[in-house]
Amino acid sequence: MNTQIEYKLLDARLAEQLPAYATPGAAGLDLRACIDLPLEIAPGQTTLIPTGIAIHIADPGLAAIILPRSGLGHKHGIVLGNLVGLIDSDYQGQLMVSCWNRGSVAYAVQPLERIAQLVIVPVVQAQFRQVDEFEASDRGVAGFGSTGRG
């Protein structure tokens, strides 16, 4: 699928490092920390980091999600403070990344370091219909852990 999304470059340093798919099979584009100096995130601390880019998806059938980079989370404990960022199709502001240090050691984010990834996803705005009872299903109301392990 080839979908065009408008973007604004808010930090000239990104001109040579625009978000791009690294491989033909890549789902996400890397977002960078557009900061001037290293930014230390202490254990347990959350900070909001600008990416230097704004997007306008425009198509109400699409949205974007911001996800953590697996290496930062696994090696350094740096994940998203809001776990997943949701960017609606009508949002036009700068993309910001909430970084949370869930680790036990401070981590210094470097200027233009890749800190998160952006994935474009389809959206369905479902119509809801109130009912008194649901049609029976195999699972019913069985909740957390009800399907077992393995």
UniProtKB/Swiss-Prot annotation:
Enzyme class, top EC level, equals: hydrolase
Q: Which cofactor does it need?
A: Mg(2+)
The reactions it catalyses are: dUTP + H2O = dUMP + diphosphate + H(+)
Which positions in this protein are listed as binding substrate? 69-71, 82, 86-88, 96
A GO term for molecular function = magnesium ion binding
EC number(s) on file: 3.6.1.23
InterPro entries with a match to the protein in the record: dUTPase, dUTPase-like, dUTPase-like_sf, dUTPase_trimeric
Q: Which domain of life is it from?
A: Bacteria
Q: Which UniProt keywords apply?
A: Hydrolase, Magnesium, Metal-binding, Nucleotide metabolism
Per the record, the pathway is: Pyrimidine metabolism; dUMP biosynthesis; dUMP from dCTP (dUTP route): step 2/2
Q: Give the GO biological process terms.
A: dUMP biosynthetic process; dUTP catabolic process
Task: Cite the CDD domains for this sequence.
Answer: trimeric_dUTPase (cd07557)
Would the keyword Hydrolase be found if you checked this record's keyword annotation? Answer: yes
The entry's family comment says: Belongs to the dUTPase family.
Q: Give the NCBIfam families listed for this entry.
A: dut (TIGR00576), PRK00601.1 (NF001862)
Described purpose of this protein according to its UniProt entry:
This enzyme is involved in nucleotide metabolism: it produces dUMP, the immediate precursor of thymidine nucleotides and it decreases the intracellular concentration of dUTP so that uracil cannot be incorporated into DNA.
Q: What is this protein called?
A: Deoxyuridine 5'-triphosphate nucleotidohydrolase
Q: Which organism is it from?
A: Leptothrix cholodnii (strain ATCC 51168 / LMG 8142 / SP-6) (Leptothrix discophora (strain SP-6))
- Which gene specifies this protein's sequence? dut
